[in-house]
Structures are given as C-alpha cells and as structure tokens.
C-alpha cells in the first residue's frame, strides 16, 4: 500500500472485508433515490451549503478551469456527530430522504464501513513511513469525510460541450 501511494498517489483495495451485499444494498438505495422526480430530489438540496450534506442537482458543480458544469448529480453522506460535539457548528447533520426505504441504514452503513477501512489504511501508511501505528488517529477521528454517490445521466446529444466530471483534484489535500 505504501509503495502504491508513493508511486501513484492512490491505490485500489480488494479483499477489504466490506460485504458485497452491503455495497449492493447501498447502490440500490442510491439508484432508487436518483430515479425520483427532480422536484422530489430538490427537497433535499441545501442551497448555500456547498453541497456538504444531502442532494446536489445537475448544473451546480463545475470543475476547476472548466467553462461548463459537470453532467452529474450527487448525494453527500458524512459523519454523524454526538449532539454536544465541538464540530457540530462546522459539520452539518446528514439529511435522509423519506421516499427511499433503507436509505439511511444502507447509505450510512456503507459510509461507516468505508470510514473504518480508511482508518485501517492510515494505520498501514503510518507503519510504512516509520510512525506509530495510531499516529493519524487523533488527527482524523472526527474528520469531515463524505461518501458521495454520483449519478451520471445518459448523454443524449453529440454536440454538448460538458463532460460528466471534469479533471479535478481532491480539494481537501
């Protein structure tokens, strides 16, 4: 894992232990949400929040240096904080659609599984660079990570200038 990050800056992880049934259940609820009518989905769009939680419709996000918005809509799921958390004022609570049964359970379940996997990766990377295994733990334990299921619509015209998602970098790094 350390070599992959040194050479490429990322890696693909197989054998991670997240059950395929859990991944499939999350994909199912995400697909059912994106299939809802636009006016229903827009109930979950939080204007002025930068899409930190809930739904972001088509035409909102534009990649850096692009003239046209990306052809995608997405949903953000983030960490659920204890009520008295000192981070509550900077990390919005999650929003859960009422129209899709199981969305919260499957969506947040996958978020938690991926968050735990991320912690395992950080422990491995810490050891790779000769740090204590738990070096990153107190630096990320309340991090504002997100799970972002994205829906890319079918492209129905050949002359559109947009791309589904323009070239980009992780904005928080």
What are these regions (language model features)?
Residues 1-173:
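Peripheral, non-catalytic segments flanking oxidoreductase cores
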């Amino acid at each position: 894992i350390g070599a992959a990050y040194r050479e490429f800056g990322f890696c693909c992880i197989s054998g991670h232990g997240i059950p395929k049934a859990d991944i499939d259940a999350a994909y199912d609820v995400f697909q059912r949400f994106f299939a809802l009518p636009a006016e229903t989905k827009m109930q979950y769009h939080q204007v002025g929040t930068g899409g930190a939680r809930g739904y972001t419709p088509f035409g909102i996000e534009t990649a850096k240096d692009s003239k046209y918005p990306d052809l995608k809509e997405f949903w953000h799921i983030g960490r659920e904080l204890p009520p008295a958390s000192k981070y509550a004022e900077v990390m919005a609570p999650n929003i859960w659609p009422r129209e899709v049964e199981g969305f919260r359970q499957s969506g947040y379940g996958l978020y938690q599984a991926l968050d735990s996997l991320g912690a395992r990766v950080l422990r491995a990377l810490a050891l790779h660079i000769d740090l204590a295994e738990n070096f990153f733990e107190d630096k990320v334990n309340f991090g504002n990570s997100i799970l972002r299921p994205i829906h890319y619509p079918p492209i129905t015209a050949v002359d559109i200038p947009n791309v589904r998602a323009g070239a980009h970098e992780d904005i928080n790094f």
